[in-house]
């Protein structure tokens, strides 16, 4: 199985390393050329216990790759694209979705086969609808009909314990709205949930809300 993760910051890099450590072929995409150059040399720009060794191990095994080109990742035959780009606050405090929707548009401009577009970034409820519209708009511009799904898969790992949290999650929340997307996400997470049924499937809006609710509880 092949997947791509767009955004090689904290969430994207930890997710990519952990997925690859379980045998999935992962391509991490980032527009920052210097960051990608460093990662290709196994220089990890963040500190997280166990991450450096995990990146080195999976790069050497050719399961973890880095590129600045999302098109290159899509052309390699990935089945899912996880969006882990930033959502910085606007002046009014609302989430800036320009990076999230930029990824969606680029996917629509380049896909030729089915993919599931999975949002890992913390986003407002309803973002998946905007992502779907952005992908479809680009497909319409190209005059092509390519099937795709959208999904929400928020992360809950803690800094300093991210590897352990990801590899042995107490829950994996996934918001989907088609059986095909659900089956794909089950395949992706099967190695992480063999010991017990930790996957929680909801509709997409509920998954988006769960992340916001969890953040609000942690902030109190």
Predicted regions and their residues:
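NAD(P)+-binding Rossmann beta1-loop-alpha1 motif at the extreme N-terminus of oxidoreductases
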Residues: 1-43
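Conserved N-terminal Rossmann-fold NAD(P) cofactor-binding segment
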Residues: 25, 31-80, 86-95, 135-141
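Conserved beta-strand termini and adjacent loop/short-helix elements that scaffold enzyme active sites
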Residues: 29, 67-69, 151-153, 202-204
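Local beta-strand N-terminus motif with an aromatic residue
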Residues: 77-78, 114, 169
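Glycine-rich, N-terminal phosphate-binding loop of Rossmann-like dinucleotide-binding domains
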Residues: 83-85, 121, 176-177
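Rossmann-like NAD(P)(H) cofactor-binding subdomain of soluble oxidoreductases
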Residues: 88-156
């Amino acid at each position: 199985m092949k997947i791509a993760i767009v955004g090689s910051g904290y969430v994207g890099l930890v997710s990519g390393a952990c997925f690859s450590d379980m045998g999935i072929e992962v391509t991490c995409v980032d527009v920052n050329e210097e960051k990608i150059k460093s990662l290709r040399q196994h220089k990890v720009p963040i500190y997280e216990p166990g991450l450096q060794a995990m990146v080195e191990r999976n790069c050497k095994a050719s399961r973890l790759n880095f590129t600045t080109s999302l098109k290159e990742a899509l052309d390699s035959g990935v089945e899912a694209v996880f969006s882990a780009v930033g959502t910085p606050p606007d002046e009014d405090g609302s989430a800036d979705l320009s990076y999230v929707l930029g990824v969606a548009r680029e996917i629509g401009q380049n896909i030729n086969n089915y993919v599931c577009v999975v949002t890992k970034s913390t986003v407002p409820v309803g973002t998946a609808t905007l992502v779907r519209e952005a992908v479809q708009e680009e497909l319409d511009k190209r005059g092509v009909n390519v099937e795709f799904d959208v999904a929400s898969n928020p992360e809950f790992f803690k800094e300093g314990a991210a590897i352990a949290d990801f590899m042995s999650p107490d829950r994996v929340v996934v918001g989907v709205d088609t059986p095909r997307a659900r089956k794909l996400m089950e395949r992706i997470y099967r190695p992480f949930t063999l010991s017990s049924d930790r996957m929680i499937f909801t509709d997409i809006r509920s998954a988006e809300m769960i992340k916001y609710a969890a953040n609000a509880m942690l902030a109190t």
